[in-house]
Amino acid sequence: GIDCRLLLVPRHAERALEIIRLLKQQPLTWHQRSQNTATPNSVSIQLADTTGELARLTQVADLAFVGKSLEPNIGGQTPIEAAGIGIPILMGPNMTNFKAVAKSLVHSGAALYANDENQLKALVLDLAKDSKARAAMSQAGRDWHADNKGSSARIAHTILAALD
């Protein structure tokens, strides 16, 4: 087996109650950060339902999975922050909200697609055991982020120039 922890970060704080209900139905130990209690060392799942901590919490991640990217969900959340801090990215095929970004990250080697839950599980297990692959994906993510930094300003400049 592998020694791992899961950090759940709901995009919307109001989802915390739904997530807590689901956590209570499964056997793993979990902790809710907003309860302001010390996190037990043996906790398996951390529910990050607090504000302003995402950047600090994700600094220690070895892998990131992009939410809302596997069936039955569609759209996907942003993988940009994970790439910027060098976290290897896994995502489902339903990245319609970030289609070009997702494709570019996969092409750069910073991310991998998982077509379903079984493939996601296999990729997580493979990458958990392969520090060289994680390191390569991490560097690819940081490189991708650096290469794309300032792209909004460049696009805006191009649009404004075309309007003149």
Locate the predicted segments by residue:
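Nucleotide-activated sugar donor-binding and catalytic core shared by glycosyltransferases
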Residues: G1-D164
